[in-house]
Amino acid sequence: MKITRLTTYHAAPRWLFLKVETDEGITGWGEPVIEGRARSVEAAVHELAGYVVGKDPARINDLWQTLYRAGFYRGGAILMSAIAGIDQALWDIKGKALGVPVYELLGGLVRDRMKTYRWVGGDRPGAIIQQITDYRALGFDTFKFNGTEEMKLIDSARAVDAAVVKVAEIRGAFGNTIDFGIDFHGRVGAPMAKALLRELEPFKPLFVEEPVLAEQAEYYPRLAASTSIPLAAGERMFSRFEFKNVLCAGGIGMVQPDLSHAGGITECVKIAAMAEAYDVGFAPHCPLGPIALAACLHVDFVSHNAVLQEQSIGIHYNEGADLLDYVVNKDDFHCVDGSIAALPKPGLGVEIDEEMLKRANENPPDWRNPVWRHSDGSIAEW
């Protein structure tokens, strides 16, 4: 079998799909994208196509190493996302060719279902409480929400109090009947992160995500020493080499690589194993589409330290299309009591409606993340 062609499709709300074709008629799907930089990743995918067209798709490890090492300059968000999407598609092809789900190729199941959590939006406690109430009725008991809006490097007691009041109201509304993570989203600098963690500790969040930006990873062990709240990070780390440094330094209780940003299945299986060796949980970041979610689930199902899976089915920011709109076999992704069962179909287990994708690609989205500014006019982290 040889790879013959790579085709990309843009689709609302902010996704890029990749179809990899072979001379035997077996196709694989991947999702290589950086939110807000889809065209940059698309260009990288087609630039890398020359390394894979004409090659045997079954040699996934060799192709991955070629894509990563054949360029003198390597790594980074764009290239690793391009590699990720190609890698996902190669695993999809191999599973379909052999008639088994990808998790069987990775050694088989360590669990039968994977616990997922719901992201809930809004900055007012009442809006978040209502969303949690609605999702609890569907069987979910674990959630995540943003901890704060933009925050200055050194900010006021009012800013801290606003974040604390929101969390206090949510915990007060539900008691310990729910768990929640709080996402700082890299909006908080190290000085304020320490203050916020101290004030939030009485409300027992399940974790705090991106307490500081990945560029400030040296603060993770210092912040961890100041709190009992588990810290999570990794959505803006793109290879096992970045995770190596963080794991060796300590401080992180949960790693969150993105299967569409951090080199795909091949790389993230290694990251999960590295984390397990350090007694660190694995909870892939996934605010993206169905192929990214499927890739995450296959790694979750073979990783003993996988603790939670993010997913964006029905989430408020999926404007123009929802996660399962491009999927034929929607029932395979059905959540029961907040968990998704092992995907039964060969490969990644996603049947894509390509005709719908083609129509979506005729009117491609141009999503970009908001640009925030502080009151003095300086740029703020979103």
Swiss-Prot record:
Q: Which InterPro entries match?
A: DgoD-like, Enolase-like_C_sf, Enolase-like_N, Enolase_C-like, Galactonate_deHydtase, Mandel_Rmase/mucon_lact_enz_CS, Mandelate_racemase_C, Mandelate_racemase_N_dom
List keywords of the entry alphabetically. Answer: Lyase, Magnesium, Metal-binding
| Similarity comment | Belongs to the mandelate racemase/muconate lactonizing enzyme family. GalD subfamily.
Protein name in the entry: D-galactonate dehydratase
Task: State the residue spans of region: Disordered.
Answer: 361-382
Role summary: Catalyzes the dehydration of D-galactonate to 2-keto-3-deoxy-D-galactonate.
Pathway recorded for this protein: Carbohydrate acid metabolism; D-galactonate degradation; D-glyceraldehyde 3-phosphate and pyruvate from D-galactonate: step 1/3
Native species: Xanthomonas axonopodis pv. citri (strain 306)
Q: Which cofactor does it need?
A: Mg(2+)
Extract the PANTHER family matched here: D-GALACTONATE DEHYDRATASE, D-GALACTONATE DEHYDRATASE-RELATED
Q: What class does this enzyme belong to in the EC scheme?
A: lyase
Record GO biological process: amino acid catabolic process; D-galactonate catabolic process
CDD domains for the chain: D-galactonate_dehydratase
Cofactor mode of binding and number, as noted: Binds 1 Mg(2+) ion per subunit.
